[in-house]
């Protein structure tokens, strides 16, 4: 089967799939006929089986593994569009995108949900787990995709990035800007790296531009509305 989806209202992706999971996942993202795809991807049964073999959880299906493989295949082709996949949650607030990332289990979803509650009616999710980050005309944007985590927080939207914030747990709520060297040490763990050497060189240049042009912060916080206030007061003014 073939599915087409429009990512962030700008990039049309066509994927060939075996299991109906993908069709359901992309249902609200599908476009009418007439769009020429920017990216076309498909994955093999061997790739699906390799992905499946890497999981031990009984709840993981081959259909879910196919979805993971397809997004990985998409990520490999994004460099041609000055874009990459990042692990993180992105909120849109007053026309700006705020990117939050953290080590697994720290609580980026919990923190971003607090933002949505705190700024009721103003803040919304662009993507809750794996957004596409893209440089367009010298400006960095975050894009929603159908791959948005188990909570399915996200939308078919995009916004220019205001700031990127690394979340850590803390008893008190503190935020500080960090230098490029520390940014590199932290952010590269959250990016999808292409495998082939030529694409990797191009990717590294793109990632360097990402680090140079955007402000990065570390937020040490607890689970409270004050954590949102402390973060917003700094991030919104950069």
Placement of each model-derived feature along the sequence:
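Conserved lysine of the Walker
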Residues: 108
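P-loop NTPase catalytic core of nucleic-acid-dependent motor ATPases
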Residues: 59-97, 101
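Intrinsically disordered, low-complexity, positively charged segments
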Residues: 16-35
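Short, small-residue-biased leader/transition segments that mark boundaries at the very start
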Residues: 1-13
């Amino acid at each position: 089967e073939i599915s087409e989806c429009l990512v962030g209202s700008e990039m049309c992706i066509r994927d060939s799939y075996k299991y109906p999971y993908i069709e359901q996942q992309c249902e609200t993202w599908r476009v009418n006929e007439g769009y020429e795809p920017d990216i076309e991807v498909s994955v093999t049964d061997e790739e699906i089986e390799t992905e499946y073999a890497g999981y031990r959880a009984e709840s993981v299906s081959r259909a879910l593994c196919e979805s993971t493989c397809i997004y990985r295949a998409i990520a490999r082709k994004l460099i041609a569009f000055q874009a990459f996949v990042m692990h993180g949650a992105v909120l849109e607030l007053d026309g700006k995108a705020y990117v939050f990332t953290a080590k697994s289990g720290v609580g980026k979803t919990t923190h971003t949900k607090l933002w949505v509650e705190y700024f009721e009616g103003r803040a919304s999710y662009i993507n809750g787990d794996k957004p596409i980050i893209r440089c367009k005309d010298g400006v960095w944007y975050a894009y929603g995709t159908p791959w948005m985590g188990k909570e399915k927080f996200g939308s078919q939207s995009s916004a220019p990035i205001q700031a990127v914030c690394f979340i850590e747990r803390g008893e008190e709520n503190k935020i500080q800007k960090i230098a490029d060297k520390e940014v590199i040490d932290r952010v590269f763990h959250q990016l999808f790296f292409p495998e082939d050497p030529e694409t990797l060189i191009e990717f590294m240049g793109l990632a360097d531009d990402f680090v140079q042009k955007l402000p990065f912060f570390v937020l040490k916080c607890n689970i409270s509305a004050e954590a949102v206030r402390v973060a917003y007061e700094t991030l919104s003014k950069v």
